[in-house]
Amino acid sequence: MDMMKIIKKYINSEEEAQKLLKWAIDNANIYYLRNIVNTKVNIEETKFKTVHNIGIEYSKDNKYKLSYRNKPSIATNEKYKELCNLIRSTNGIEKETLRYLLFGIKCVHAKVEYDIEKVPDYDYSNYFDVLKEKSTIRCVACKSNNTIPMILQTRSSDEEPTVRVVCKDCGKNFAPPRLKFN
């Protein structure tokens, strides 16, 4: 199957098509999981002929269990119908690659990044290194600021936890100073 030919039906840029194909093949190889195929020989499907098509398809697995699946009453993915049909007709690693290609093509058309590794993340640096020297408690034994608070025991919501401060330099632990309320 010529994947490049399939991509070219949806994407005009040669460079973008090459990048997308490489990304899809890499991800399909990494995250490929075997799809468990229903091996039951007899699957009876009953289609309801209702006055109002509510979009539910009824399928009967065996005589004891019933399962319901949503069946869209409005055809979706008309723009990508050929690619969706290819996904249905293939299996294995090709199917996974085509699924990634479909996702990537939709992202390219929507002008969003398809590679999660390139999506900019939030800057969490403000949440780390919160225990600076100015905000840490001074050790009662060696007067060092290299201390860290530790919760030893948590209680119910109406009681405060047992907290001790441990000095990393001398190894002593002590109770934190109490705040006085007027």
UniProtKB/Swiss-Prot annotation:
EC number of this enzyme: 2.7.7.6
GO biological process: DNA-templated transcription
Residues the entry annotates as binding Zn(2+): C139, C142, C167, C170
GO MF annotation terms: DNA binding; DNA-directed RNA polymerase activity; zinc ion binding
Keyword Coiled coil: no
UniProt GO cellular component terms: DNA-directed RNA polymerase complex
Domain of life: Viruses
Keywords: DNA-directed RNA polymerase, Metal-binding, Nucleotidyltransferase, Transcription, Transferase, Zinc, Zinc-finger
Principal EC category: transferase
Reaction(s) the record says it catalyses: RNA(n) + a ribonucleoside 5'-triphosphate = RNA(n+1) + diphosphate
Function recorded in the entry: DNA-dependent RNA polymerase catalyzes the transcription of DNA into RNA using the four ribonucleoside triphosphates as substrates. Rpo30 may have a role in RNA chain elongation.
Subunit and interaction comment: This enzyme consists of at least eight subunits.
Family per record: Belongs to the poxviridae DNA-directed RNA polymerase 30 kDa subunit family.
The protein, known as: DNA-directed RNA polymerase 30 kDa polypeptide
